């Protein structure tokens, strides 16, 4: 489903011209890295499953309750709605008007690519492609998606840091979680640098200008103009950040409801400790879409919560299956676009 053409923001004089210059080309394949990630994911899953009873795991899955599954799926739908609202706030801040329905369809297709490709980059490419025409600039559309990502990262790391502190208060000490707190502070510093300290930001971009390549210079100019406009609209940034925090809360509720669907009592407070930490750790580019890492982290927490490894694996796998099932709707929309 295509997006309607709307006027580009008047504050971007270079937006339309920038795409006329040829882009530098290049690329390489990384099959060895992909194989290493696959091996790690498989190894972690095998390690976790080694300590489980497959019969007990099957019995857990047999207890699934459809009403609770529907409730969990509704949380995923709410997550999409809030995410689209965040995205629209950032587009509006750049004077780009795109209908909510078009953004929702684009985000849903992006979810499909995120869940069925080995990284999240494919989904971002979809979102950029769908908004480049209304924005009048691929660079502008890319910058907006990247800002959305940075704010989402700040929210995730902040909630993850709170989760790590909550785990310590419950007597669950996770080695290395101090780096989540360091990461949250670093993400906050990055946001301040990007949006509210133009002098320092321009110094950071100076090496790119020094390259002297017209293609790079044009895109850096659009990037700086876009960040300047965001800096003049702090309420839009605050709203998008608040939306990102809400998304993290909704994901916590999704996993708590997924556990309930399996007759596993995972209190919301415990889910609020477990899920953010798991999400942060599975961001590490060492596995295929977090497989293995997620199950290992869930097992670590569930054992300490007295719930058992089988329950951890069941909740993790069912949650992943529901997310992938939901994202199949995006795959259907993608096929409709092609016809």
Q: Residues of each region from the PLM?
A:
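Selective transmembrane-helix segments that form parts of the transport pathway or gating/packing helices
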Residues: 149-154, 320-324
């Amino acid at each position: 489903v295509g997006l309607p053409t709307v006027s580009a923001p008047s504050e971007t004089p270079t937006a339309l011209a920038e795409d006329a210059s040829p882009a530098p080309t290049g690329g390489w394949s990384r099959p060895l890295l992909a194989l290493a990630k696959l091996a790690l994911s498989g190894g972690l899953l095998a390690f976790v499953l080694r300590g489980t009873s497959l019969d007990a795991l099957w019995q857990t899955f047999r207890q699934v309750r459809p009403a609770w599954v529907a409730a969990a799926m509704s949380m995923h739908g709410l997550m999409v709605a809030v995410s689209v609202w965040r995205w629209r706030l950032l587009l509006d801040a750049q004077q780009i008007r795109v209908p909510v329905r078009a953004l929702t369809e684009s985000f849903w297709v992006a979810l499909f690519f995120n869940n069925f490709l080995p990284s999240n980059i494919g989904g971002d490419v979809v979102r950029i492609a769908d908004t480049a025409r209304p924005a009048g600039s691929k660079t502008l559309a890319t910058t907006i998606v990247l800002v959305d990502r940075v704010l989402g990262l700040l929210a995730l790391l902040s909630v993850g840091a709170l989760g790590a502190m909550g785990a310590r208060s419950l007597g669950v000490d996770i080695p290395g979680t101090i780096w989540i707190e360091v990461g949250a502070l670093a993400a906050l510093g990055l946001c301040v640098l990007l949006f509210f300290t133009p002098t320092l930001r321009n110094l950071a971009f100076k090496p790119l200008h020094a390259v002297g390549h017209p293609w790079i210079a044009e895109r850096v100019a659009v990037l700086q103009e876009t960040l300047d406009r965001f800096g003049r609209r702090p309420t839009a940034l605050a709203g998008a950040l608040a939306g990102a925090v809400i998304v993290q809360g909704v994901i916590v509720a999704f996993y708590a409801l997924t556990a309930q669907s399996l007759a596993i009592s995972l209190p919301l407070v415990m889910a609020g400790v477990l899920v953010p930490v798991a999400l942060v750790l599975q961001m590490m580019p060492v596995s295929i879409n977090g497989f293995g890492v997620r199950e290992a982290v869930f097992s670590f927490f569930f054992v300490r919560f007295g719930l058992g490894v089988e329950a951890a694996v069941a909740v993790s796998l069912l949650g992943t299956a529901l997310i992938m099932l939901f994202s199949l709707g995006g795959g259907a929309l993608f096929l409709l676009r092609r016809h």
